[in-house]
């Protein structure tokens, strides 16, 4: 009897078990909530480029609606916090952490559309309405063009900085057969980096390093032609093992193509002859450039599609970190181009303005201002420091345990140490101990907008707008208020005594 046997060349083993990640459901949560809110946060500057110091003119920063606003919110240490009940946790085996359960990002200023552009934009032909191809690209055909950029509303909440991605110049292999020569297109690489405060967003021209990849300095508007435009790396942040960089995010993007141009310059990748029939002169032989581009437009802005000035409640995060603010800090990343109005300011430059309008008598300036307000609802959570939990936290961020005063106790040294009798004299070497090194901030080299909320926590939720909204949706009743009325017992006693007096009088 013939039997069929499978091939013995391959053996499939079960996959290795995935290490468990500590979730917030494994922690103890108390029904103790705190409100914390910032003051009015304002910034003002030039929307296209920074202005350096020159003579008596002060430095003016670049402030654009197409920049990321990354707020680094500093929270107080709950283990050193004045709690209503000192028996909430055991400091020997437990630690307290904050959990963000509610947030509202307030935006001021009216809705508006801000323009960006370039006085010498690389524009050869209007390819949308062109009636004749122009092959002469040797002359300077740059023109003054302005656009209304892509419309974006974005808000990312996490306890570590968000990550962004953009296309940059890659590296060429040393053993490559053909090296990149001068004038050739360089290899590209997708670069992932931290999004800092002031980084430019994707305005509709792509997420790329325009400084390194566009040598003309006129292919995009002024506000990005010497900048790096980053797009949030949602895929990488969503796949993060710990889920610290993005608890949740709000996003709304809108864009359409408004005008269509082609670029002047020598074509690096010529159109193959097999793809067209040669023309008979009249500007069609040789054909003009085939490097096409369009100007973006964010279209209409309306209050019906606003993501800001609304409360959001975090019930279940998309990652493993369900709102725990490790390190007592929170990162809020915001973008709002629906309030991108640029303020135009004019002043009289001449000693006395003429009766008729003369442009040279006036100076024109442009500025952009932004207004933010941050409000949070935090919940108090308790962590039991088991061996697995401490190993997990140490792998994620070892500085957390150091800030909790957990560390290795070194054994006593067995070597013989020197002890001088007379220390403070010129005959003995200096015995001063080396000063303790300050704790290094892991984000000290990055740029963020610091917001200190260490002294702005309040347990009276009903005294703040966001707190009252949270109490309504959570079903929390307000605390009874103190009044000037007499207690009910005294009222009942007095009323009973008056009735007795009336009865005696009637008798």
Curated annotation (Swiss-Prot):
This is Major capsid protein L1. It is found in: Virion; Host nucleus. The lineage of its organism: Viruses, Monodnaviria, Shotokuvirae, Cossaviricota, Papovaviricetes. GO terms for cellular component: host cell nucleus; T=7 icosahedral viral capsid. Self-assembles into homopentamers. The capsid has an icosahedral symmetry and consists of 72 capsomers, with each capsomer being a pentamer of L1. Interacts with the minor capsid protein L2; this interaction is necessary for viral genome encapsidation. Interacts with protein E2; this interaction enhances E2-dependent replication and transcription activation. HAMAP family: PPV_L1. Residues 488-498 have a biased composition (Low complexity). Its main location: virion. Gene3D superfamilies: Major capsid L1 (late) superfamily, Papillomavirus. GO terms for biological process: endocytosis involved in viral entry into host cell; virion attachment to host cell. It comes from Human papillomavirus 69. Forms an icosahedral capsid with a T=7 symmetry and a 50 nm diameter. The capsid is composed of 72 pentamers linked to each other by disulfide bonds and associated with L2 proteins. Binds to heparan sulfate proteoglycans on cell surface of basal layer keratinocytes to provide initial virion attachment. This binding mediates a conformational change in the virus capsid that facilitates efficient infection. The virion enters the host cell via endocytosis. During virus trafficking, L1 protein dissociates from the viral DNA and the genomic DNA is released to the host nucleus.
């Amino acid at each position: 009897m013939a039997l069929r046997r499978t091939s013995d060349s391959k053996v499939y083993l079960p996959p290795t078990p995935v290490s468990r990640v500590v979730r917030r459901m494994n922690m103890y949560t108390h029904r103790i909530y705190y409100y914390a809110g910032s003051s009015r946060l304002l910034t003002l500057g030039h929307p296209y480029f920074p202005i350096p110091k020159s003579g008596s003119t002060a430095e003016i920063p670049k402030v654009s609606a197409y920049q990321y606003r990354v707020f680094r919110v500093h929270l107080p240490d709950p283990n050193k916090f004045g709690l209503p009940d000192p028996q909430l946790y055991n400091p020997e085996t437990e630690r307290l952490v904050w959990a963000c359960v509610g947030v509202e990002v307030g935006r001021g200023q009216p809705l508006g559309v801000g323009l960006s552009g370039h006085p010498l934009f690389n524009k050869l032909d209007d390819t949308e309405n062109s009636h004749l191809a122009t092959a002469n690209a040797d002359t300077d055909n740059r023109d003054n063009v302005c656009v209304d950029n892509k419309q974006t509303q974005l808000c990312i909440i996490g306890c570590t900085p968000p990550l962004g991605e953009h296309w940059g110049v890659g590296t060429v292999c040393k053993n490559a057969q053909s090296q990149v020569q001068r004038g050739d297109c360089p290899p590209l690489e997708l670069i992932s980096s931290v999004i800092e405060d002031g980084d430019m967003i994707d305005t509709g021209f792509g997420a790329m390093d325009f400084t390194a990849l566009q040598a003309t300095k006129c292919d995009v508007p002024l506000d990005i032609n010497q900048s790096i435009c980053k797009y949030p790396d949602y895929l990488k942040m969503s796949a993060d093992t710990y889920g610290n960089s993005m608890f949740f995010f709000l996003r709304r993007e809108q864009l359409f193509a408004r005008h269509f141009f082609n670029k002047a310059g020598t074509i690096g990748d010529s159109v193959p002859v097999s793809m067209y029939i040669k023309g008979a002169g009249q500007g069609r032989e040789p054909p003009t450039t085939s490097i096409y581009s369009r100007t973006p437009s964010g279209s209409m802005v309306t209050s019906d599609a606003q993501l800001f000035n609304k409360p959001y409640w975090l019930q279940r995060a998309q990652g493993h970190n369900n709102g725990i603010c490790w390190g007592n800090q929170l990162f809020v990343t915001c973008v709002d181009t629906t309030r991108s109005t640029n303020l135009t300011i004019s002043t009289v430059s001449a000693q006395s303005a003429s009766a008729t309008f003369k442009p040279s008598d006036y100076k024109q300036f442009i500025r952009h201002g932004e207004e933010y307000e941050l409000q949070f609802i935090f919940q108090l959570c308790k962590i039991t420091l088991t061996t697995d939990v401490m190993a997990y936290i140490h792998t994620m961020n070892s500085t957390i345990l150091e800030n909790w005063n957990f560390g290795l106790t070194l054994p006593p040294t067995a070597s013989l140490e020197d002890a001088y009798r007379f220390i403070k004299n010129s005959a003995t070497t200096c015995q001063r101990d080396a000063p303790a090194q300050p704790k290094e901030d892991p984000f000290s080299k990055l740029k963020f907008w610091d917001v200190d909320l260490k002294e702005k926590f309040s347990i009276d939720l009903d005294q703040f707008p966001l707190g009252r909204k949270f109490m309504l949706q959570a079903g929390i009743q307000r605390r009874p208020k103190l009044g000037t009325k007499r207690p009910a017992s005294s009222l009942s006693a007095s009323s009973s005594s008056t009735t007795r007096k009336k009865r005696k009088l009637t008798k």
